[in-house]
């Protein structure tokens, strides 16, 4: 296999206008890979460390140190390694960093090299990235979980839940699912406008109307689904990302939700009522990131009807996921490559989840680039679900468009996950 001969990093801008790391890896057969590293707004305390410069430049968010770490420390260490030995490349970087959370070199430095190496190796093997990583049997196209109303840390809308997503479960193909989602999205704009609300957008391309409650937001989307000519619960289902750590008061031990202070038990009842009244297939981070007992209880209560997804709760970390499996806390893993900081560790987390019947949802971050790696990963790892924001804004649509290409490449072998991706329809 071709060897790494050059690694170069640079500082670029993400979709929020903040700096991030881009890395290029060159092999001795002239194969090449490039990767841009995403960044989150609501970040879990257990995530791998994203290295920022501090100071005045870019309001402290510069990544020149991470870039320097790639160019001056990581590059010499991985030069000469075979690009198809992903685990060795990642191990060399992890050993070089030496910390528990990648705080010395920066997860944003390590991940950039890790992803760019995989892309270069795929190019060298003359394979699509999804085929290189997933092998000849990778053929399942994921359900796009489109975030069409943004709240929480992603917008100034006033609603506490961070993401209101639609899942086109009734589609026969990814192409049809994308069309359905786009049609609902455009109809939602007219519904919001007709109510005299703002059609401004949040970080992930969804609308950010000033609504007072979760139910009000869901009702707006339900109206848009109907207006688009689709049946709620048959063609289109709902999914939520509560990102509840963002409205949890650690000092008081309560959730400041919709104008009141609520206990974990109260929140469990809130979610039970929502699942009862709306066709919700997935709830992400319903409780704060260290409430193991609460997650276990919630999963026991409604886990047979709905997917309970650990994002900040698991942070794509195999060790935390293992604990969750043992405690029967949550039943699905949100997969964010930059939470753990290397491709090998991401693959380990996905495999651990799937081996224990936990579903996986591949995910973008609110600060994205035009990089489409996660689209390929969602197919390579047979996730069956992906969230990449609204069907608008090019950094979001880039991933969905890549999935269109993959579906076209697979031809008759392509299978759209559809309803089978969720426990509500596939218990």
Swiss-Prot record:
Pfam families: Enolase_C (PF00113), Enolase_N (PF03952). It comes from the Bacteria. One of its GO terms (molecular function) is magnesium ion binding. Its EC number is 4.2.1.11. The active site is at 204 (proton donor), 336 (proton acceptor). The keyword Transit peptide does not apply. GO terms for cellular component: cell surface; extracellular region; phosphopyruvate hydratase complex. Keywords: Cytoplasm, Glycolysis, Lyase, Magnesium, Metal-binding, Secreted. Binds a second Mg(2+) ion via substrate during catalysis. Mg(2+) binds at residues 241, 284, 311. Its main location: cytoplasm. (2R)-2-phosphoglycerate binds at residues 162, 336, 365-366, 387. Its cofactor is Mg(2+). Pathway: Carbohydrate degradation; glycolysis; pyruvate from D-glyceraldehyde 3-phosphate: step 4/5. GO terms for biological process: glycolytic process. It catalyses: (2R)-2-phosphoglycerate = phosphoenolpyruvate + H2O. It is an enzyme of class 4 (lyase). Signal peptide: none annotated. CDD domains: enolase. PROSITE patterns: ENOLASE. HAMAP family: Enolase. Catalyzes the reversible conversion of 2-phosphoglycerate (2-PG) into phosphoenolpyruvate (PEP). It is essential for the degradation of carbohydrates via glycolysis. Belongs to the enolase family. This is Enolase. It comes from Corynebacterium kroppenstedtii (strain DSM 44385 / JCM 11950 / CIP 105744 / CCUG 35717). The lineage of its organism: Bacteria, Bacillati, Actinomycetota, Actinomycetes, Mycobacteriales. The gene is eno.
